């Protein structure tokens, strides 16, 4: 609240994964590969108790040279219970063709920005860091503490086991087969 927000918002990546997870059954449940993301914007804060929904628009299609698969480009919008867009992003996914002999769709590859501009970003109304307590947050480093080319060794590594991988994907409601079925991939890996 000291930062001008009504309460602590959910972590942005938690909100992203919930919105992303809702798209999996319709976009990438049986994907060969999730290829990339672009133009991701968090446009409004998400708070505990919000209801999130996702909708995706197909904005591009391209058959691969193998003619057995292709790339689908989608723009996904996540909204809250008030219909406010809380985030949007573009992603592209490689999927198999239903019929390898089917004619290729018209190729449409969307033009995507290489990077977002400051004008593309949304700053929550009322947000201020004038009273933010950096010491209480446990983060002593500021912009002037870093240098270009500096290497930071993050010593606290962690091993993610299969059970944790599956638990995380279930938590975010990501039902893509590759996360749960070791027989889905030819190499037997997830």
Which sequence ranges carry the predicted segments?
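HotDog/MaoC-like acyl-thioester-processing domains
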Residues: 44-133, 143
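Hot-dog-fold acyl-thioester-processing enzymes
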Residues: 1-37, 98-190
